[in-house]
Amino acid sequence: MSQPSYFDAMGYEAMIAEYGRPETFVNEIARMPPDKLQKLQNERFLKVMAFAWKIPFYQRHWGAANLTPDDIRSIEDISKLPPYSKENLMASVEAYPPIGDFHGLDTYADNDRPPLVFQTTSGTTGRPQPLLYGPKSREIQNLLLARFYAMQGIRRDDVLHSVYGHGMVNGGHYVREAVLHWTGAQLLTAGTGIETRSANQVSLMKDFGATAIIGFGDYITYLAGVARKEGLE
């Protein structure tokens, strides 16, 4: 038996039926009556908890707090769950190199294991933390970001200029996926000033009619200064 492809494992039709497209969230889900929304949140929370209890990291972390699955019966019990830190995750990586034991891969049979998207944190505070995404969790992340963009008014006829980087960090990659997979807008993946020179970024925005820019505020402010130097307002 061959392993499932990314798109098969993602389950696009089922995902759309369950979560809706970004415009569905803005027009329907965000306006859902509180009791109906709480019921939906509770169902999804319990589903996530059932999966998490199969993962050694959470078994160990919650077990240390004397919790059992029977202690968490609804989303109202979420305050019983002890928080965990990056230090906890990196301790897992140290004990179970190279990716730790918090990812849930061992819950799948070899032939059913989905493809993975692998990223890391930036490592600015130490060793980079591995970030692993299965197809469905990856696309749900992308969809959540696309909802955020939709709520800010991004539509299919927009041209977005992104200055998020595209190294091992997740930033620019999931921004690109969110925009292309879920908004229908045109994306200029310029990246950082190292990837595309700042003067070239300004030219790209002018030539292709960028209607919005996404990224870190300090660099966007810097690009505004570059644009003025280039005679663009």
Descriptions of predicted regions:
Residues 146-182:
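Conserved AMP-binding loop of ANL adenylate-forming enzymes
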Residues 123-130, 155-156, 180-184:
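Gly-rich Lys/Arg/Thr-decorated short loops/hinges at beta-loop-alpha junctions or inter-strand turns
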Residues 79, 141-159, 196-209:
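Conserved ATP-dependent adenylate/AMP-binding module captured primarily in the ANL superfamily
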Residues 52, 121-124, 160, 213:
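Conserved S/T- and glycine-rich ATP-binding loop of Class I adenylate-forming
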Residues 2, 7, 47, 51-54, ...:
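Conserved adenylate-forming
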Residues 133, 163-164, 215:
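Small/polar loops that bind or transfer phosphate-bearing groups
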Residues 1-120, 127-140, 151, 207:
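Nucleotide 5′-phosphate-binding alpha/beta core
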Residues 115, 138, 165-169, 218:
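Short glycine-enriched loops at secondary-structure junctions
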